[in-house]
A protein has these predicted regions:
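Short beta-strand in the C-terminal region of the ABC ATPase nucleotide-binding domain
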Residues: 234, 239-242
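ABC family nucleotide-binding domain
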Residues: 21-227, 232-235
Length: 283
């Protein structure tokens, strides 16, 4: 499962061979206004290749707006957003649509699966929309479902899947086009505790093989387990930013409560397997 970096086809797109630590996401003084409401206020942020960054804050702080900006679902009122060498503000609507399909993968809180399609077709459709043949798309979709431990549910419709199974299908869909950046919007918010922990393990494994992650969450446990850096927002701005890689020594979670002793970037490092299956390492 190699994170792959294809541009959306715009002129001057970067070479797909990134080096570790290269800036993948750069927001420079980004503001967003909705009428009289200022959702983002001159916010600047960088995310490097291979990082897992969690964004937290109270409702209305701007974290969902931030995610939508990076996902190409909305445009800023001011400032620039650069993702994998592309200035999103310079893309046409067609270019933005291609960017959303190829360069970023999105994991939704409530899964956003198509009810009338079985799991395999839900995943395969993501690649077919970028021009991949149905046969090739279904083959890769099956490989992903197998790696995520739900291949035996490939012919099941979403309504017959558990919440954890639906989220795994959603993760497979997000990974289908080998995105440079994986975005997660409250990925465990609709799950029970056990399923939520399994999805956290999955995010940790993906990050350990090189996948860049941006996670928006209210959950300090998710943030401290899955991220190496925490961005706390308030009133459309970054109020605090800190590394979580020393949190075993810090002993506090983002909300100031005692931590559970989680190790940096999750549990025991295992960069070669996901769900007990071998994975390709990022190039």
């Amino acid at each position: 499962m190699t994170p792959h970096h294809e541009s959306a086809g715009s002129a001057g797109s970067p070479d797909s061979a990134d080096s570790p630590g290269q800036v993948v996401v750069r927001l420079d003084r980004v503001s967003k206004e909705y009428g009289d409401t200022l959702a983002l206020d001159a916010l600047s942020l960088e995310i490097r290749r291979g990082e897992a960054v969690a964004v937290m804050g109270p409702s209305g702080c701007g974290k969902s707006t931030l995610l939508n900006m990076v996902a190409g679902l909305d445009r800023p009122s001011a400032g620039t957003i650069d993702v994998h060498g592309q200035d999103l503000g310079g893309l046409t609507e067609t270019g933005l649509a291609l960017y959303r399909r190829r360069d970023v993968g999105m994991i939704f809180q409530f899964f956003n699966l198509i009810d009338d399609l079985p799991a395999l077709d839900n995943v395969a459709l993501a690649a077919q929309l970028t021009g991949t043949s149905a046969r090739q798309a279904r083959r890769r979709a099956l490989e992903l479902l197998d790696e995520l431990g739900v291949a035996d549910r490939r012919n099941n419709y979403p309504a017959t899947l558990s919440g954890g199974e639906r989220q795994r299908v959603g993760v497979a869909r997000a990974l289908m086009n080998r995105p440079a950046l994986l975005l997660a919007d409250e990925p465990t918010g609709a799950l029970d505790s056990r399923s939520g922990e399994q999805v956290m393990d999955l995010l940790i494994d993906l990050n350990q093989i090189g996948q860049t992650l941006l996670i928006v969450t209210h959950d300090p446990h998710l943030a401290t387990r899955c991220a190496g850096r925490l961005v706390e927002m308030a009133d459309g701005r970054i109020a605090r930013e800190r590394s979580l890689n020393d949190r075993a020594l810090d002993s506090e979670t983002p909300d100031g409560t005692a931590s559970d002793g989680a190790t940096p970037n999750g549990a025991t490092p295992n960069s070669e397997t996901l769900n007990g299956k071998p994975l390709e390492r990022s190039a």
